[in-house]
């Protein structure tokens, strides 16, 4: 049994889960992206995929990994890699390591929180909204367009609208204001998502397996994640049972053992769902409310890791060349 963490060793959610796993006494290793130039991956392919990860001070047999908690960033964006540039050996190495570990995470029989294929829906917000509607949540009227006149018509119809990223790339949700009219022409070069503004109270819901942690956010900013001068209050709360059940079912069907769900209850009491985050930075809410989200994730990883059998994925290093051997050293 071995639980593998992959991402930036300085990232708070990764630190929090790692601390809880150690408190449980669960065998845990970290693949720290900050040390990617000293990380090598070797994969062997036969009836399954196995191999080893070599770091500066460690060697990890992937056949022993029974659970994986992944929060990787694009390693090519790390300062040392970005400075070296796309044509450098450092860049090629970083991209290769990322690709190989992501590929392995899709094929391993180990528990993965969360698999890349399950997280993919977040790369298309309109597609994800269609999934959300199936679970009885209201969704705002939405326009995805490169037509400035269509955007203007949509704005005039709803009176108040917001604009946001179409993809998984983070953006600050903002309301369209009169001074933005001169910029509407820019959408011709950038597909932009516009949504009907829904007045009401914000809720963030974290689902961990079957556990649900909800909190209410009070803030007058368009996007409470970037409140500016607006005060913000976050408090733990309990959702109506049917809303809690829908959140749990939504995460389950989307195959996301850990998910962050953004809700808003409008002034008439209807529940709107804006999106499902497949890799939530839950520590922001945990620190504000004291909710034991990192503990729940650690317990889920450890509990499922104990029942996972990956023994059939073992490969001997001397046998790899008969199958497929891939490794890169800068």
Enumerate the language-model features and the residues they cover.
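Loop-centered beta-sheet repeat module
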Residues: 121, 125-172
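Short acidic-glycine loop/turn motifs at beta-strand connectors
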Residues: 45-47, 56, 207-211, 266-269
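Glycine-rich phosphate/pyrophosphate-binding beta-alpha loops
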Residues: 277-289
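Extreme N-terminal starter segment of soluble prokaryotic enzymes
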Residues: 1-4
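Phosphate-binding site of ATP-dependent enzymes
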Residues: 21, 154-244, 250
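Protein kinase-like catalytic core scaffold
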Residues: 161, 213, 259, 272-274
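A long amphipathic alpha-helix within ATP-dependent nucleotide-binding catalytic cores
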Residues: 224-271, 294-305, 309, 317-329
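Conserved N-proximal alpha/beta basic substrate-recognition cap immediately N-terminal to
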Residues: 8-20, 29-138
């Amino acid at each position: 049994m071995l639980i593998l963490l992959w991402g930036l060793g300085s990232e708070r959610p990764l630190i929090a889960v790692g601390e809880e796993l150690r408190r449980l006494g669960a065998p845990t290793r970290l693949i720290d992206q900050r040390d990617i130039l000293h990380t090598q991956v070797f994969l062997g392919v036969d009836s399954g995929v196995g191999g080893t990860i070599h770091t500066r001070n460690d060697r990890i047999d992937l056949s022993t990994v029974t659970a994986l908690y992944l929060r990787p960033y694009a390693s090519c964006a790390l300062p040392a890699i970005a400075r070296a540039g796309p044509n450098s050996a450092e860049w090629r190495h970083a991209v290769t390591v990322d690709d190989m570990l992501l590929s392995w995470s899709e094929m391993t029989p180990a528990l993965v929180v969360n698999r890349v294929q399950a997280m993919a829906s977040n790369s298309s917000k309109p597609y994800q909204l269609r999934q959300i509607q199936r679970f009885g949540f209201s969704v705002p009227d939405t326009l995805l367009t490169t037509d400035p006149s269509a955007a203007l018509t949509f704005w005039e119809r709803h009176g108040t609208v917001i604009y946001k990223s179409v993809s998984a790339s983070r953006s600050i949700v903002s309301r369209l204001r009169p001074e933005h009219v001169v910029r509407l022409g820019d959408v011709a070069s950038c597909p932009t998502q516009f949504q009907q503004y829904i007045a009401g109270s914000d809720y963030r819901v974290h689902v961990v397996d079957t556990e649900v942690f909800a909190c209410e956010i009070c803030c007058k900013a368009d996007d409470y994640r970037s409140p500016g001068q607006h005060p913000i209050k976050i408090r733990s709360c309990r959702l109506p049972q049917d809303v809690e059940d829908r959140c749990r079912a939504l995460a389950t069907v989307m195959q996301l053992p850990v998910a962050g769900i953004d809700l808003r209850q409008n002034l008439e009491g209807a529940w709107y769902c804006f999106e499902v985050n497949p890799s939530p930075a839950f520590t922001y809410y945990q620190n504000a409310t004291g909710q034991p989200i990192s503990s729940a994730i650690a317990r889920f990883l450890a509990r499922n890791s104990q029942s996972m059998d990956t023994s059939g994925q073992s490969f001997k290093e001397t046998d790899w060349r008969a199958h497929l051997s891939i490794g890169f050293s800068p």
